[in-house]
Regions:
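Intrinsically disordered, low-complexity polyampholyte segments enriched for Lys and acidic residues
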Residues: 13-14, 18, 36-38
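Membrane-anchoring hydrophobic helices of lipid-metabolizing enzymes
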Residues: 36-176, 181, 208-213, 219
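Non-catalytic C-terminal accessory region of glycerolipid acyltransferases
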Residues: 36, 41-43, 49-51, 56-59, ...
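Short, positively charged and aromatic/hydrophobic N-terminal segments
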Residues: 3-5, 29, 35
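Catalytic core of membrane glycerolipid acyltransferases/transacylases, capturing the structured
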Residues: 167-227, 249-261
Length: 354
């Protein structure tokens, strides 16, 4: 189940640099990526069905997914306090049985918080798995809970910054990170503004169909496959907002080593290049769950000024510093089970257990 949830969290995968962007050759080169010559093909899913009720999905191999989705719909209807309690218990269980991911998260915390004692990091690790379990319920709420169930739970701060950026008419890159609250945070934003979500299509056609269906239903705009440069630029020309989170490791291609928690970290550089190519404003936003059952706050910050600066490395480092600041506010709610430091500078040792 931990692997399922981890892969789910990667579903909103913004990594424009992992695979060559598809669209115009000139545009792809301006972003700094290769062009593969086929603007229509998304090879991750071959001809996924567009309807949820499809005879293919009655095959036994899809039954576990149907069961999981059914449980998530039930979870979304539970009282909020029950969700927090049950989610926390599930997360703690995942932390005990998901030994590999627990070791990865522990390695990440040791790298990023060397100033904390081993006991403090162990406590933070337990809190992280609690947040992961709650994140399952938050995902269910994001997809299936009615608005009236959620309105009293969320406070959006700084909505005027998003409105001002959209008023420019050149589109907005809604910049964030992979927090356990990411699906619910995006749902809260859509109350103010429809948005596209950059994501990597899922290999399983049933999960891909459900994921696209629910995100489009709530976001009011279709998700964009991460290699669809043409669709991305079209959205910006229409003055639309696009969800984007450049904080995961996908290798050296179109990446650079810049500091993140003081560690040279392989980081996608496409944010700066996309902003330069499209003229879109970059508006950071960060959702966070409040202590107890107090709900959520979504902090929308002013559009980044003097961005892009013309220095891609400086721009990328600026984004990492911004992410680090907000991760430190709620460190347990960041996705530490991802191997963020997998790609290392030449001569540097592997930081993760085998």
């Amino acid at each position: 189940m931990l692997t399922f949830y981890y892969r789910f969290m990667q579903g909103l995968d913004e990594q424009i640099g992992k695979r060559p962007l598809q669209g115009s050759r000139q545009g792809a080169r301006q972003v700094g990526l290769a062009y593969n010559g086929n603007p229509m093909k998304h090879p991750t899913v071959a001809n996924p069905p567009t309807r949820l009720w499809n005879w293919r999905f009655l095959a036994p191999r899809y039954w576990p997914i149907w069961l999981g989705l059914g449980l998530m719909k039930v979870m979304a209807a539970l009282p909020f306090r029950w969700q927090l309690t049950a989610g926390g218990q599930i997360g703690r269980l995942l932390g005990r049985i998901g030994r590999r991911r627990r070791k990865i998260a522990a390695a990440n915390l040791a790298l990023c918080f060397p100033e904390r004692s081993p006991a403090e990091r162990a406590e933070l690790l337990d809190q992280h798995f609690t947040a992961l379990g709650i994140g399952l319920f938050e995902t269910a709420m994001a997809w299936w809970a009615p608005d009236e169930q959620l309105h009293d739970l969320a406070e959006i701060k700084g909505a005027e910054h998003l409105e001002e950026a959209l008023a420019r008419g050149k589109g907005v890159i809604l910049l964030t990170g992979h927090f356990t609250t990411l699906e619910l945070g995006a749902r809260f934003i859509t109350w103010r503004q429809p948005l596209h979500a950059m994501y990597r299509p899922h290999k399983n056609p049933l999960y891909e169909t459900v994921m696209r269906r629910e995100r489009e239903r709530r976001s009011r705009l279709p998700p964009l496959p991460h290699d669809d440069l043409r669709g991305l630029l079209r959205a910006f020309r229409k003055g639309q907002a696009v969800w984007y989170a450049p904080d995961q490791n996908h290798g050296l291609r179109n990446s650079a080593f810049v500091p993140f928690f003081g560690i040279p970290t392989c980081t996608i550089t496409a944010t700066s290049r996309l902003a330069a190519l499209s003229g879109a404003a970059v508006v950071p936003y960060f959702p966070r769950r409040l202590p107890g059952a107090a709900g959520y706050v979504v902090d929308i910050l002013p559009a980044l000024d003097h961005f892009p600066s013309g220095d891609v490395l400086a721009d990328t480092q600026r984004i990492n510093a911004l992410l680090e600041t907000h991760i430190r506010q709620v460190p347990e709610q960041y996705l530490w089970v991802h191997r963020r430091f997998k790609t290392r500078p030449p001569g540097s040792p592997n930081v993760y257990p085998l």
